[in-house]
């Protein structure tokens, strides 16, 4: 019985491998799809910056000559932005770490997280 089970598992593994992609694959999706890379930790930050740019670059000392009213309006805009971002994040089923580190990802999937 053990030999039969082992042979069946090997055949199933070969069928799954031959149906899908070559190289790195997402195994949690049906059908299996190719991935560009599997990255974790600082590599995710580096790839995000490479594909999305640095969102903090060039923003320093950008706001000058503000009066009290424009500061208040900026505060409201910031709160609206944070609320909208929170809703987007809460609606996502996965985050970038799960997507790229655990499953592997494509460049297009990283770009979905760009602000």
Swiss-Prot record:
<dbReference type="GO" id="GO:0005576">
    <property type="term" value="C:extracellular region"/>
</dbReference>
<comment type="function">
    <text>Heterodimer with unknown function. Surprisingly, the truncated synthetic analog (dimer of 27-58 and 94-115) does not bind to long insulin receptor (HIR-B) and insulin-like growth factor 1 receptor. This truncated synthetic analog shows very weak inhibitory activity on different voltage-gated channels.</text>
</comment>
<feature type="disulfide bond" description="Interchain (between B and A chains)">
    <location>
        <begin position="40"/>
        <end position="101"/>
    </location>
</feature>
<dbReference type="InterPro" id="IPR016724">
    <property type="entry name" value="Insulin-rel_pep"/>
</dbReference>
<dbReference type="Pfam" id="PF00049">
    <property type="entry name" value="Insulin"/>
</dbReference>
<dbReference type="InterPro" id="IPR036438">
    <property type="entry name" value="Insulin-like_sf"/>
</dbReference>
<feature type="disulfide bond" description="Interchain (between B and A chains)">
    <location>
        <begin position="52"/>
        <end position="114"/>
    </location>
</feature>
<keyword id="KW-1015">Disulfide bond</keyword>
<protein>
    <recommendedName>
        <fullName>Insulin-like peptide IlO1_i1</fullName>
    </recommendedName>
</protein>
<keyword id="KW-0732">Signal</keyword>
<dbReference type="InterPro" id="IPR016179">
    <property type="entry name" value="Insulin-like"/>
</dbReference>
<comment type="similarity">
    <text>Belongs to the insulin family.</text>
</comment>
<feature type="signal peptide">
    <location>
        <begin position="1"/>
        <end position="20"/>
    </location>
</feature>
<dbReference type="InterPro" id="IPR022353">
    <property type="entry name" value="Insulin_CS"/>
</dbReference>
<feature type="propeptide" description="C peptide">
    <location>
        <begin position="59"/>
        <end position="93"/>
    </location>
</feature>
<keyword id="KW-0872">Ion channel impairing toxin</keyword>
<dbReference type="GO" id="GO:0005179">
    <property type="term" value="F:hormone activity"/>
</dbReference>
<feature type="disulfide bond">
    <location>
        <begin position="100"/>
        <end position="105"/>
    </location>
</feature>
<dbReference type="InterPro" id="IPR022352">
    <property type="entry name" value="Insulin_family"/>
</dbReference>
<keyword id="KW-0964">Secreted</keyword>
<keyword id="KW-0800">Toxin</keyword>
